[in-house]
């Protein structure tokens, strides 16, 4: 396996990236400028195409999977930035916990 693919796996299913299974960057928070804010705070995850875009479980087709990632992203942001819930909501517009 080429070095560029070592240790990269899907955040949800842990499928390892290969030449034939490329991982895609998913911005945890999107819409109304939140994609750029996600970039700024490192709130992105790598997903295989199936977990990213394929029904029925792909994050863009499944509200439960999306909520799981929103909750993960909120916890990560609050922990890494030292924010309380109110600060998170002031930046991202919603509490997901």
Which residues does each predicted region cover?
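Short flanking/linker segments adjacent to small metal-binding domains or redox-active Cys/His motifs
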Residues: 71-97
């Amino acid at each position: 396996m080429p070095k560029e693919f070592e240790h990269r796996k899907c955040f949800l299913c842990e499928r390892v990236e290969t030449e034939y299974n490329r991982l895609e960057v998913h911005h945890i928070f999107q819409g109304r400028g939140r994609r750029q804010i996600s970039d700024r705070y490192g709130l992105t995850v790598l997903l295989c195409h199936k977990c990213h875009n394929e029904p029925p479980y792909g994050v863009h087709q499944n509200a439960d999977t999306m909520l799981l990632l929103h909750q993960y992203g909120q916890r990560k942001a609050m922990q890494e930035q030292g924010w309380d819930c109110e600060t998170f909501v002031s930046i991202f517009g919603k509490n997901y916990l």
